Amino acid sequence: MGLIRVLANLLILQLSYAQKSSELVIGGDECNINEHRFLAIVHTDISLCTGTLINQEWVLTAAHCDGGNMDIYLGVHNESVRYDDEEGRVPAEKFFCLSSRNFTKWDKDIMLIRLNIPVRNSAHIAPLSLPSSPPSVGSVCRVMGWGTITSPNETYPDVPHCANINLFDYEVCLAAYPEFGLPATSKTLCAGILEGGKDTCVGDAGGPLICNGQFQGILSWGDDPCAQPRLPAVYTKVFDHLDWIQSIIAGNTDATCPFVNF
């Protein structure tokens, strides 16, 4: 078993820029240009991640995607073709569940970013709403990004790819990764394809898991090589963090994250 992808993501900037390092999905197809208007590229000194625009001023991503000199790009479909409505932003503020930015307890890998300037809805930019209810085990979920489409050797395309995967009971991930000592209960989601072949991968961290049209998860980590049988990925559960997200957006910067008894 290789290093988990949360670590591999931090090494992605060492790749040649000739490879077009960004975000993508193993076993997927090119996304429809109209289905990812909320998708953000999150670029820092140490990593390339993705994020999700949840209103004109706020982006959700993974805490481990934090780094210096962060740039956020919205409205991108083809990295070699610039659209008139593409937007670049930097963070005005970043908020974390833990003041120490410690995501090693797995349930706290979430970061809320306030953009320095709000974006406007356009042909290629529009937010994705927060979920109104939790997801159901067995749901078919959509993942997307510009990350590597091959693993362990990495190949980066110019356009985002999308794939459908399944939402499992959390116990499936407990059984898949016994060596990590995962907590018995968790505010994360477990998703993938048990027979392998489709998966998120290096560079997709922080990206959305969309189940039945609702934004339910933020990619946290998975196995490397990607898309192996019976080794699904782990996603921060957005629904369980709604109170924290909405409180921060409303101006309560002292809001605390939900507690899990480990």
Swiss-Prot record:
Assembly and oligomerization: Monomer.
Keyword presence, Ion transport: no
Keywords, in A-Z order: Disulfide bond, Glycoprotein, Secreted, Serine protease homolog, Signal, Toxin
Intracellular or extracellular location(s): Secreted
Tissue distribution of the protein: Expressed by the venom gland.
Covalent S-S links between cysteines: C31-C162, C49-C65, C97-C257, C141-C211, C173-C190, C201-C226
GO molecular function annotation: serine-type endopeptidase activity; toxin activity
Example GO biological process: proteolysis
Superkingdom as given in the UniProt entry: Eukaryota
A GO cellular component entry from the record: extracellular region
Propeptide intervals in chain numbering: 19-24
Protein name: Inactive snake venom serine proteinase 13
Glycosylation site list: N78, N102, N153
Occurrences of domain Peptidase S1 (ranges): 25-250
Similarity comment text for this entry: Belongs to the peptidase S1 family. Snake venom subfamily.
Secretion signal span: 1-18
InterPro entries assigned: Peptidase_S1_PA (IPR009003), Peptidase_S1_PA_chymotrypsin (IPR043504), Peptidase_S1A (IPR001314), Trypsin_dom (IPR001254), TRYPSIN_HIS (IPR018114)
